[in-house]
């Protein structure tokens, strides 16, 4: 009733489109934040925020062992955040990334809230923590953070490699 019908590898077309459209839109929001807020840089505080997030995600990952989606989601965030926080060339992008993430959470909150309030998206309680912000599983926010951070990281690294190649 809520999907078009075509499936690829067992997943609805809409699910596959999510993995293309959302990252593209997120990178756009990130670029807009960089352009309009280029003078804002709270790198020290943002790094501290992300280190605290690593700590919180680590604790909750351990506590959620057995709820496999929650565990893998949080553990993946921990690993990638530690990696990103140790790549010195990416540090200058963290402030704008965090701003873009917070802005991108607004439409994500609205759309995801509608999808989870209606019977469009249902979650298997045996693999999720069942902790929700309104109707949205908290894992959706950490998953979105990871998805957006990976895409922005690859985007910035690709730009850097292209510029280095052009200058040589």
Regions inferred by a protein language model and the residue ranges of each:
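Short aromatic-rich membrane-water interface segments that cap or initiate transmembrane helices
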Residues: 2-17, 128-142
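Short juxtamembrane and helix-loop transition motifs at transmembrane-helix boundaries
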Residues: 4-10, 27-41, 55-65, 129
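Hydrophobic cores of alpha-helical transmembrane segments in multi-pass inner/ER membrane proteins
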Residues: 17-31, 76-82, 139-155
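Membrane-interface capping segments at transmembrane-helix boundaries
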Residues: 35-39, 156-168
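Membrane-interface helix caps and helix-loop-helix hairpins in membrane proteins
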Residues: 59-71, 88-91
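Hydrophobic core segments of alpha-helical transmembrane domains in multi-pass membrane proteins
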Residues: 71-80, 100
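Alpha-helical transmembrane segments in multipass membrane proteins, preferentially the mid-helix core
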Residues: 77-96
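C-terminal transmembrane helix-loop-helix hairpin of multi-pass membrane proteins
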Residues: 97-104, 113, 117, 124-152
């Amino acid at each position: 009733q809520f999907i078009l019908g075509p499936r690829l590898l067992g997943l609805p077309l809409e699910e596959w489109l999510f993995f293309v459209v959302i990252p593209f839109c997120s990178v756009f929001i990130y670029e807009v934040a960089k352009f309009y807020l280029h003078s804002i840089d709270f790198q020290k505080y943002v790094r501290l925020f992300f280190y605290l997030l690593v700590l919180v995600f680590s604790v909750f990952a351990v506590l959620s062992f057995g709820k496999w989606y929650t565990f893998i989601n949080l553990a993946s965030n921990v690993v990638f955040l530690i990696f990103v926080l140790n790549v010195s060339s990416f540090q200058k992008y963290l402030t704008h990334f965090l701003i873009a993430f917070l802005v991108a959470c607004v439409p994500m909150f609205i759309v995801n809230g509608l999808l989870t309030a209606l019977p469009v998206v249902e979650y298997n309680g045996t693999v999720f923590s069942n902790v929700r912000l309104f109707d949205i599983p908290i894992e959706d926010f950490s998953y979105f953070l990871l998805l957006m951070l990976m895409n922005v990281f690859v985007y910035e690294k690709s730009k850097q490699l292209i510029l280095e190649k052009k200058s040589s």
